[in-house]
From Swiss-Prot:
This is Cell division topological specificity factor. Belongs to the MinE family. The keyword Ion transport does not apply. It holds the Pfam family MinE. It comes from the Bacteria. The lineage of its organism: Bacteria, Pseudomonadati, Pseudomonadota, Gammaproteobacteria, Chromatiales. It comes from Nitrosococcus oceani (strain ATCC 19707 / BCRC 17464 / JCM 30415 / NCIMB 11848 / C-107). Keywords: Cell cycle, Cell division. Prevents the cell division inhibition by proteins MinC and MinD at internal division sites while permitting inhibition at polar sites. This ensures cell division at the proper site by restricting the formation of a division septum at the midpoint of the long axis of the cell. SUPFAM superfamilies: Cell division protein MinE topological specificity domain.
Length: 96
């Protein structure tokens, strides 16, 4: 009987350990999918800077984090409008 109890206790312990490890893996995958917590603020700051120079719609800016090897890469895709005078030039000409 003592042999059965010995193996049973180990099995229960390993199942618990496996469950904890799986929960850790799932938590890491969720974090990776959602991206860093600062990404929305970074997106807003980037849009603000771009708007100093050209008029864009927020929907035209796509930002995502990618992993290439051991490096995190910030991928930025901006749909620019057709060539038009910069905002500063249009503002100056409208004042005259």
């Amino acid at each position: 009987m003592s042999w059965f109890n010995y193996f049973r206790a180990t099995r229960g312990n390993s199942a618990r350990t496996a469950k904890e490890r799986l929960q850790i893996v799932i938590a890491h995958e969720r974090i990776d999918r959602s991206g860093p917590s600062y990404l929305p603020r970074l997106r807003g700051d980037i849009i603000e800077v771009i708007r100093k120079y050209i008029e864009i719609d927020e929907d035209q800016v796509k930002i995502q984090m990618e992993q290439e090897g051991d490096m995190d890469v910030l991928a930025l895709n901006i749909q620019l409008p057709d060539a038009s005078p910069p905002l500063s030039e249009t503002r100056h000409s409208s004042k005259q």
